[in-house]
């Protein structure tokens, strides 16, 4: 794993690319989410965790930020929903994420699936303050960059306008909004929300701090 991800990071860095949307930290059984088959490190969180860590460390040692996919875990998703409770997730899907957090993962992508047993409603996790701020940042103690899954995905666009989705993601605690269906509308929605006081400038600064902290770390490593 270290050798493979080291080779990937070296190639990316040679082209000036400083972030990789990998590794996939989900765990999935043979009967689980078919879209993840062959992309994960297995069906057991305790076994997969050191492999995820090896991938993260190998990327980041070469100044390429790892982005762990896809919190809270899509391995057992049915009809766009995770049916496990918080305690069940802590003992299974969260093991890889928790371990990588403790080992300094730069960024975590939050999924567009919902987790009603954890959040109490069907809000997509990428737009849920309960999932991002309370669980990921609070329970798991993560203070790195949070990236949403693609906001142009039908799970989002079927229920939210581009502007509303962008605002909801930032209010929930996300730092990077990935691929809204219409960037201009998403951007204007954020500007309008700041003007209205729905999003404070301090909230934007929090995200900028997390992003620049990683950029500065990588730049400093390159200088050294």
State the predicted function of each range.
Residues 199-205, 220-223:
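Flexible, glycine/charged-enriched surface loops at secondary-structure junctions
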Residues 16-27, 104-105:
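Short coil-to-beta-strand
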Residues 27-35:
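Short, conserved phosphate-binding/catalytic loop or strand-edge motifs used
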Residues 38:
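Aspartate-rich (DDxxD/NDxxD/DxxxD) Mg2+/diphosphate-binding motifs
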Residues 211-223:
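Structural signature of the thiamine diphosphate
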Residues 43-203, 210-213:
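Second-shell residues forming the walls of enzyme active-site clefts
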Residues 1-16, 20:
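Active-site-adjacent structural elements in enzyme catalytic domains
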Residues 11, 15, 58, 214:
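Short alpha-helical functional segments enriched in proximate histidine and acidic residues
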């Amino acid at each position: 794993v270290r050798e493979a991800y080291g080779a990937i990071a070296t190639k990316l860095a040679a082209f000036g690319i400083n972030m990789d949307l990998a590794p996939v930290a989900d765990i999935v059984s043979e009967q689980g989410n078919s879209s993840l088959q062959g992309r994960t490190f297995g069906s057991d969180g305790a076994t997969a965790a050191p492999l995820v860590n090896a991938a993260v460390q190998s990327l980041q040692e070469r100044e390429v930020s790892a982005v762990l996919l896809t919190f809270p875990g899509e391995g057992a998703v049915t009809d766009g929903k995770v049916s496990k409770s918080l305690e069940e997730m802590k003992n299974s899907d969260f093991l890889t994420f928790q371990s990588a957090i403790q080992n300094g993962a730069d960024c975590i992508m939050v999924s567009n699936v919902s987790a009603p047993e954890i959040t109490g409603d069907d809000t997509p996790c990428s737009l849920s303050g309960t999932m991002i701020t309370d669980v990921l940042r609070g329970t798991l103690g993560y203070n790195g960059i949070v990236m949403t899954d693609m906001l142009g995905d039908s799970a989002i666009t079927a229920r939210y306008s581009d502007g509303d989705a962008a605002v909801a993601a930032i209010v929930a605690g996300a730092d990077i909004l990935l691929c809204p269906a219409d960037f201009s509308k998403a951007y204007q929605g954020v500007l309008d929300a700041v003007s209205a006081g729905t999003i404070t400038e301090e909230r934007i600064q929090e995200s900028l701090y997390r992003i620049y902290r990683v950029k500065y770390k990588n730049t400093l490593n390159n200088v050294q």
